[in-house]
């Protein structure tokens, strides 16, 4: 078995491609079941965020497993394979392991060191278990990645003052609008991103903020976290009325189709009304046909890169410190993974030795006579089992502890030959 990751991110694909491959949580079980149905995929987990879609898999055949994942992505996004491949990356074995640890640590994020991705990795692990996508290998890998992410944040300063997608969007809005305190601002959506938007808008002096959401209860929960802000709450049917009266609109919903487009904006807006749209959703909430509309400035997540770049240089040194910690975690996982190669051989050897012990014990007890056997069987049983365990213990400990891959393979081959073991290979 080997580990592979196939995916795309803000580094390899623009938002118009990423949004086609975004997998919402409601569709995750179906996607995992579909992937597990391929003949060469044994375990699978999916990280889907606004900046990345990555599929981690344990594959019985590396090349065929990667082809199956690529085929799945092509079908999911309704994208031709030749077109899709130019945006995909594929990492195998230790490179795949290292990549996930870097993702969890925030080193692969658009916003270097941002903390939200660690929560998303935890969610991927939890849902992968719930929907039976994750097995022994990916369970251990994701736990190692979560440990790595926590270590990087606790043992380095990379997370201190890190901007997020939401804070970068607010920063960009302030740059474009100059004074947020005198602007009517609306946020469409009431999830985690919306909460962060409110938090950063308030810190920049915004005072007139309206939340528009499908669920009034969800909007109330958000408003309750900022009692001092007196947030205005509106339901989705009033969305266009709110947009028409706003100077700045942020969109952060889980809608799979655009909710703002040329048609409804043209109908709702006064011809002389100036509006700024900041769309931090993937799939996009603002349609591409909005670009070029008179009086409207529209920005999406890919437009945040300039804001993030200002923050990047000061964080690069901290990222280098984090790399050393990640290598320790990569090595820890690699040692565990490689030790699994010994499991079939050790198990087979123990089974064979135990069979011999039981056979020889039965012969000895029959020669000793029924009365003696019944009286002393437990003692003799414990004696023989103790001898076997003592003989096998030290070689097995040394075998598991052997870090040199080639040396371990030679030891395994020697055991197979010397004891004539017939083993079905489980890990390659």
UniProtKB/Swiss-Prot annotation:
Active site: 50 (nucleophile)
Pfam families in alphabetical order: GlutR_dimer, GlutR_N, Shikimate_DH
Domain of life: Bacteria
Residues with site note (Important for activity): 99
Pathway note: Porphyrin-containing compound metabolism; protoporphyrin-IX biosynthesis; 5-aminolevulinate from L-glutamyl-tRNA(Glu): step 1/2; Porphyrin-containing compound metabolism; chlorophyll biosynthesis
InterPro entries with a match to the protein in the record: 4pyrrol_synth_GluRdtase (IPR000343), 4pyrrol_synth_GluRdtase_dimer (IPR015896), 4pyrrol_synth_GluRdtase_N (IPR015895), GluRdtase_CS (IPR018214), GluRdtase_dimer_dom_sf (IPR036453), GluRdtase_N_sf (IPR036343), NAD(P)-bd_dom_sf (IPR036291), Shikm_DH/Glu-tRNA_Rdtase (IPR006151)
Residues bound to substrate: 49-52, 109, 114-116, 120
This protein's domain notes: Possesses an unusual extended V-shaped dimeric structure with each monomer consisting of three distinct domains arranged along a curved 'spinal' alpha-helix. The N-terminal catalytic domain specifically recognizes the glutamate moiety of the substrate. The second domain is the NADPH-binding domain, and the third C-terminal domain is responsible for dimerization.
Family: Belongs to the glutamyl-tRNA reductase family.
Other known facts: During catalysis, the active site Cys acts as a nucleophile attacking the alpha-carbonyl group of tRNA-bound glutamate with the formation of a thioester intermediate between enzyme and glutamate, and the concomitant release of tRNA(Glu). The thioester intermediate is finally reduced by direct hydride transfer from NADPH, to form the product GSA.
Subunit structure: Homodimer.
Role noted for this protein: Catalyzes the NADPH-dependent reduction of glutamyl-tRNA(Glu) to glutamate 1-semialdehyde (GSA).
Protein name: Glutamyl-tRNA reductase
């Amino acid at each position: 078995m080997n580990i592979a990751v196939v995916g795309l991110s803000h580094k390899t694909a623009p938002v118009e491609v990423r949004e086609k491959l975004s997998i919402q949580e409601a569709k995750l079980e179906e996607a995992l079941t579909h992937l597990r149905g391929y003949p060469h995929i044994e375990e699978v987990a999916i990280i889907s965020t606004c900046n990345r879609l990555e599929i981690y898999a344990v594959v019985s055949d590396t090349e065929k497993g990667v082809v199956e994942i690529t085929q799945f992505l092509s079908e999911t996004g309704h994208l031709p394979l030749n077109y899709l491949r130019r945006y995909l990356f594929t990492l195998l074995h230790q490179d795949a392991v290292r990549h996930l640890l870097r993702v969890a640590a925030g080193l692969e994020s658009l916003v270097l060191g941002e903390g939200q991705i660690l929560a998303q990795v935890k969610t991927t692990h939890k849902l992968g278990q719930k929907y039976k996508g994750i097995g022994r290998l990916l369970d251990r890998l994701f736990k190692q990645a979560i440990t790595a992410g926590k270590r990087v944040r606790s043992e380095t300063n990379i997370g201190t003052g890190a901007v997020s997608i939401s804070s970068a969007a607010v920063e960009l809005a302030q740059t474009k609008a100059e004074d947020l305190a005198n602007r009517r601002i609306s946020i469409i959506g009431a999830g985690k991103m919306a909460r962060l938007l409110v938090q950063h808008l308030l810190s920049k002096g915004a005072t007139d903020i309206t939340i528009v959401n499908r669920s009034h209860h969800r909007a109330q929960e958000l408003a309750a976290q900022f009692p001092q802000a007196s947030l205005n709450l509106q339901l989705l049917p009033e969305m266009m009325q709110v947009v028409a009266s706003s100077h700045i609109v942020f969109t952060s919903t889980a809608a799979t189709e655009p909710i703002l487009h040329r048609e409804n904006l043209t109908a709702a807006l006064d011809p002389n009304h100036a509006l700024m749209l900041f769309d931090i959703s993937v799939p996009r909430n603002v349609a591409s046909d909005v670009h070029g509309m008179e009086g409207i400035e529209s920005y999406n997540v890919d437009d945040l890169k300039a804001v993030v770049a200002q923050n990047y240089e000061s964080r690069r040194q901290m990222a280098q410190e984090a790399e050393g910690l990640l290598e320790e975690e990569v090595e820890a996982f690699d040692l565990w993974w490689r030790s699994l190669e010994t499991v079939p051989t050790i198990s087979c050897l123990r089974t064979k030795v135990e069979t011999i012990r039981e056979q020889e014990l039965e012969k000895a007890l029959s020669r000793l006579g029924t009365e003696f056997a019944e009286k002393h069987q437990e003692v003799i049983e414990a004696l023989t089992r103790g001898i076997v365990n003592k003989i096998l213990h030290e070689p097995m400990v040394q075998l598991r502890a052997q870090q040199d891959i080639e040396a371990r393979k030679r030891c395994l081959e020697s055991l197979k030959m010397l004891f004539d073991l017939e083993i079905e290979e489980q890990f390659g």
